[in-house]
Amino acid sequence: MKLIFIFLTLLIFVSSCTSILIKESSEEERIYPFNPVASPFDPRSLNQILKIGKIGYCFDCARACMRRDRYIRTCSFERKLCRCSYSHIHHTHG
């Protein structure tokens, strides 16, 4: 019985670490297109790309919080910071 419990505990631990690593690697593969040849020094193009990156990062942060049944508390694209609330989302049944 102890062996089964230890095995299941290790399995849960390994699977949670694996999912975190997979999520981080998939985030690194995201590329937001910026073509400096088309607009070499156009700050508006660069600002648009940064807005897309910020929106995408905070959207992913919100989805991660919702998967944990929590609200998003803080999202900072510049500092790569995503924090969820301590309280759970209250579901209303109508």
UniProtKB/Swiss-Prot annotation:
Listed disulfide bonds for this chain? 58-75, 61-82, 65-84
Which CDD domains does this entry report, sorted A to Z? DEFL_AtLURE1-like
Q: Where is the signal peptide?
A: 1-19
The ranges of region (PRK6 binding) come to 67-87
Q: State the tissue distribution.
A: Expressed in the pistil. Detected exclusively in the synergid cells.
Q: Which UniProt keywords apply?
A: Disulfide bond, Secreted, Signal
Protein family membership: Belongs to the DEFL family.
- Function, as annotated: Pollen tube attractants guiding pollen tubes to the ovular micropyle.
Describe the protein's quaternary organization and the partners it interacts with: Binds to PRK6 LRRs.
Q: What name has this protein been given in UniProt?
A: Protein LURE 1.1
What gene does this protein come from?
Answer: LURE1.1
